[in-house]
Regions:
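Short S/T/G/P-rich N-terminal loop/turn motif that feeds into the first structured element of a domain
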Residues: 1-80, 84-196, 200-311, 326-350
Length: 350
């Protein structure tokens, strides 16, 4: 069982209104999402006149799979509207995931300092969304054009990979380019290969191109010889009004993931900057978070089920957590990786 603990701080005179709101607009739908209400407690156990009180709601879901199912159903307008009403009544709220310490197998985080690297050159990554109804022949034409990126001046590495579950991503393909410098990338976009082959193919066959330049925040390399693997490319955007302190806390939490989850072999967190060939009506992305895994099982198994992921990191994305700072509309792309891109750009520190 997984325990979910909501703590809501509010004036005692608003408790009846809040309880009625939960019973009428949240609890029935929560039960349909697999959440069972176990108990409701108040601390201190009396209505204070001059101070707020804390209302504690304890829920349970059966397991991690049920938890992810519950989270997948949280991003509805009805859930968002409910929590807006709650926020109007409360001074603060936060969701926690306390578990029975006696039943936990606590595993110390790994020290990843020896694996940390800097990056060189200039890398660009893009999510390519195909036009609806595109034919197999047109997909092949697009891939052929993208593969010609290997002929661009100054390019050092090119990867064109089909996303395995594009419904979770901003595109059907992940397109990566490594140049020796930003100046080389700019020159490449003026070259004949780009202007006469790649750019026209993108315009013709893609309804959106989420193309980002990457400015490294932190990177690490556990498996330099990694090949025949899986690359996860995630795009995130901070919510409007998120201050720098909260952004840095989010970044630090992401960069702790490899220490907690050893299946993340190589990683790179970068600030995102839209490129001249970016084409999308969506709000700009803030981050690119790349992870390289030995296998798809490592991504879908230990990575998704690790408590550091679902009980800690996910709260930054969850509108029910009370601490959300990242838009839940993220891009989660994962695709085959022939060889490590992070290895190609890594520079070991002195």
């Amino acid at each position: 069982m997984i325990t979910i603990q909501d703590c809501l701080t509010l004036s005692a005179d608003k408790l009846p209104q809040l309880n009625a709101l939960f019973e009428s607009e949240y609890r029935p739908a929560a039960e349909q999402r697999g959440m069972s209400l176990i108990e409701t407690r108040l601390s201190p156990p009396l209505p204070l006149q001059r101070e707020a009180v804390n209302l504690w709601l304890r829920w349970q879901v059966t397991d991690v799979g049920a938890w992810w199912g519950m989270r997948a159903m949280a991003g509805t307008p009805e859930v968002a509207a409910f929590w807006q009403k709650v926020d109007a009544l409360c001074e603060s709220r936060e969701r926690f995931y306390p578990q029975d310490l006696q039943q936990l197998e606590l595993v110390a985080a790994q020290d990843t300092a020896a694996f940390q690297v800097q990056t060189r050159g200039h890398r660009e990554t893009a999510q390519l969304a195909l036009r609806e109804g595109i034919s197999d022949a047109d997909v092949k034409a697009l891939r052929d054009a993208l593969n010609r990126a290997a002929e661009l001046p100054g390019v050092e590495a090119v990867s064109v990979a089909e996303n395995l579950a594009p419904e979770y991503a901003a595109g059907h393909y992940t397109f990566d380019l490594l140049f020796d410098s930003r100046a080389s990338a700019d020159a490449a976009r003026a070259s004949q290969i780009w202007t006469q082959h790649i750019a026209p193919a993108l315009d013709q066959h893609c309804c959106a191109v989420h193309a980002q330049a990457m400015d490294t925040i932190g990177a690490g390399l556990r498996a330099a010889e990694l090949s025949g693997a899986i690359k996860r490319t995630a795009f995130f955007r901070l919510l409007p009004g998120t201050d720098r302190d909260r952004a840095q806390r989010f970044e630090a939490d992401l960069l702790e993931m490899p220490a907690q989850i050893p299946q993340i072999l190589n990683w790179r967190l970068s600030r995102a900057e839209p490129l001249p060939w970016h084409r999308s009506d969506d709000a700009p992305w803030t981050y690119v978070w790349e992870q390289e895994f030995a296998s798809l099982d490592d991504l879908l198994g230990p990575y998704m089920t690790h408590p550091h992921h679902w009980s800690h990191i996910d709260r930054w994305f969850d509108p029910e957590s009370g601490i959300q700072a990242v838009d839940a509309r993220l891009s989660h792309a994962f695709s085959p990786l022939s060889e490590s891109l992070i290895t190609r750009e890594a520079v070991r520190g002195e």
